[in-house]
Amino acid sequence: MRPLLRGPAGNDDEESSDSTPLLPSARQIEAAPACCSARYNLALLAFCGFFVLYALRVNLSVALVDMVDSNSTLTDNRTSKECAEHSAPVKVHHNHTGKKYQWDAETQGWILGSFFYGYIVTQIPGGYMASRIGGKLLLGLGILGTAVFTLFTPLAADLGVVALIVLRALEGLGEGVTFPAMHAMWSSWAPPLERSKLLTISYAGAQLGTVISLPLSGIICYYMNWTYVFYLFGLVGIVWFILWMWIVSDTPETHKTISHYEKEYIVSSLKNQLSSQKVVPWVSILKSLPLWAIVVAHFSYNWTFYTLLTLLPTYMKEILRFNVQENGFLSALPYFGCWLCMIVCGQAADYLRVKWNFSTISVRRIFSLIGMVGPAVFLVAAGFIGCDYSLAVAFLTISTTLGGFASSGFSINHLDIAPSYAGILLGITNTFATIPGMIGPIIAKSLTPDNTIKEWQTVFCIAAAINVFGAIFFTLFAKGEVQNWALSDHHGHGN
């Protein structure tokens, strides 16, 4: 039996208003089949897009190892001696045809960090533009631009460090519009009782892109040379763009092949949630406490996420003393767990709402708590386990895996409170959530001058404390119903 779209119960308490969907009670429409549907085709193509997006983002971190002349790098060996050496000797690379550069550690840090300085700039403009011109073109151009710039990475490296830093910042500008644009598209495509499933499918591509691109980039460097990392991923991005522009539409109403029943199902399920206002209510948005609950949660979650994304390979190498080949696999393993968790949680969250009548806010709170407190606990445990390599890797993997719960929590709450402005809201929250990527690793490095286990325990404890604070703040102040300022006067008065 397919779920029916039920009407509101008629009372005004929070639990009732949170238990979407919002259709007039006089009309009940069965959910359109998922198989081969336009909305799930959109989710799968978006999945591929975010797969490519994250492959384009993280490939430099692997290629940089081959780009730098290790004999000339002006850095000391910071490998800790607290844990015993246990890795097998590293196999010598087959290929050394790629050009080498004499960049010290500080220069490499600027190259890797320059992406975020572009990424943070286009978050809010991206959300605003998506609400005006639609997310399809904006998301497509964002990934296309990043792919094209990626193709020019070898040329920029030859021109010098400044050129490469500028190029990476431009890639960040392109990627900055993508998540707000996707959120804006889902505001027109995702029925309330399918939001968790559809959004987690699409955004899970980012995790799998990280999992695949990290070891694949290493393989490409090993058997070919580092330039092909950028050429191959860049070309894949261009192919994806062509498919995206050919298949996808901004709304169900403009889709060429969608069935009449599916279009009616989607449009009807959203009709009392979308605003007809032309002017963005910026003051009301910025005064909204539920929005700031998402901001705090997003910032807190990303502090841990970016700390691990950028420093986990360092911890694996310098503290746990895994070799380069083991490091690539073990650093990708946690993100594979997170990818699986995101897919399962998307199904589970909507199942709780449909079958068990959980309210929207209850689901968002539960999944956010598990997805933020759980990682905090296991991150601290990983720090205090010392040199037990197996347990340390297991705890770090569990920590990142549990973070996948948050994908059905605060991560999609923008669509619950203001579907018409979801792209703008995500732009706002992701602007704040990008800051940890810029300062978190710097703070972590400053806290580990001697690279001891005790210093890393401090890094992990700070990240865990920030995560727990964000989870508590979101639980206290988040909402699950569409806010009054996000509705037109017509809908706001219930007519």
Swiss-Prot record:
Residues 66-109, 158-162, 221-225, 313-331, 386-390, 445-455 are lumenal. It is a multi-pass membrane protein. Changing residue 172 to C: Decreases protein levels and alters subcellular localization. It holds the Pfam family MFS_1. Keywords: Cell membrane, Cytoplasmic vesicle, Glycoprotein, Lysosome, Membrane, Sugar transport, Symport, Synapse, Transmembrane, Transmembrane helix, Transport. Glycans are attached at residues 71, 77, 95. Changing residue 183 to R: Abolishes H(+)-coupled sialic acid transporter activity. Residues 1-41, 131-136, 187-197, 248-290, 355-365, 413-423, 479-495 are cytoplasmic. GO terms for molecular function: D-glucuronate transmembrane transporter activity; sialic acid transmembrane transporter activity; symporter activity. Disulfide bonds: none annotated. Gene3D superfamilies: MFS general substrate transporter like domains. It is found in: Basolateral cell membrane; Cytoplasmic vesicle, Secretory vesicle, Synaptic vesicle membrane; Lysosome membrane. InterPro entries: MFS (IPR011701), MFS_dom (IPR020846), MFS_Na/Anion_cotransporter (IPR050382), MFS_trans_sf (IPR036259). GO terms for biological process: neurotransmitter loading into synaptic vesicle; response to bacterium; sialic acid transport. Belongs to the major facilitator superfamily. Multifunctional anion transporter that operates via two distinct transport mechanisms, namely proton-coupled anion cotransport and membrane potential-dependent anion transport. Electroneutral proton-coupled acidic monosaccharide symporter, with a sugar to proton stoichiometry of 1:1. Exports glucuronic acid and free sialic acid derived from sialoglycoconjugate degradation out of lysosomes, driven by outwardly directed lysosomal pH gradient. Receptor for CM101, a polysaccharide produced by group B Streptococcus with antipathoangiogenic properties. This is Sialin. It comes from Rattus norvegicus.
